[in-house]
Amino acid sequence: MLKIAGLYVCALFLLQSPVFADGADDWNPPSAGPITTWTAPVMDKGKLSVQPYAIYNITRGEFNAQGHYDALSDGDKQSQFQQQILAKYGITDKWEFDGQIVYQENYITDEGVKSHESGLGDSYIFTRYQFLDDKGWVPTTTGILQLKVPTGKYQHEDRDKDGADLMGASTGGGSWDPGVGINFSKKLKPFMVHADLIESFPQEVHIDGDETKFAEYLHYDAAVEYFLPKGFSLMMELNGLAQGDKRVNGGMVPDSDTKSLTFAPGIGWSNDKIQTLIAYQRVVWGANTAANNSIVATFVYTF
């Protein structure tokens, strides 16, 4: 994995010698940004952007509690098609309000039995405030407040569906999860670098009669964009998740923690009216998590 990432970065440097840009200059190439990592600059006052995503996930296996990879049994299959919409609105030139909804279709084949269910996943509400502008070696710095809203089905599982009817987030369905984070972006012409850290705090929820408290979890993301002529760009991204053991009826559930690390290269094309990106995501390591391969396509349009 590290060899692949190293070769990717080396290739970028060979393509063009970088000229490091002061963040205060007027180099602002249009871009859809990374897939998961936030970009720190917020929307201009009164501007609205809409960003739909189409995501196709194929599960090749899973990482168990010890981080060991186990492939799916022969003949078993799991896949998912997600459609997401992220909308952002600039309240002021430094403050924006965002919302994200998810609709998903789950497909499972287990020992020859096929299951298919669809429905809303969990939704998210965000507000972001830009504290610092990109200047000198200081990155654009933005604070994030977010709330996960449990709009996806999380209980009363149909045992004949092998879990296909459950639509809650992987960090725990059914809970309201407030979160707080920080986001950085830095222009280093012809590169743009982004990073974020977001800590979330799930609230207790009753699931099928059991008092369930999912552990706090941390999302940590980093991405780099490399801008080419004619509106093209290359993107590389790493996404991490760490979550502790959950509690059910007051007792800790051993080995219920979740960890994952996802690698994603992508290519984009953008102009001043529309920004596009196609990427491949692969979960390369984890614990108690699905080992997914994903194709992601997205574009941004601003009104």
Each PLM stretch: what is its role?
Residues 1-28:
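Cleavable N-terminal export/targeting peptides
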Residues 16-18, 124, 296:
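A generic alpha-helix preference that emphasizes hydrophobic side chains
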Residues 21-153, 162-203, 210, 217-223, ...:
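Transmembrane beta-barrel domains of Gram-negative outer membranes and organellar outer membranes
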Residues 140, 215, 292-294:
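Short edge beta-strand segments in beta-sheet-rich domains
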Residues 280-286, 292-296:
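A short, acidic, flexible beta-alpha connecting loop/helix-capping segment that sits on the rim
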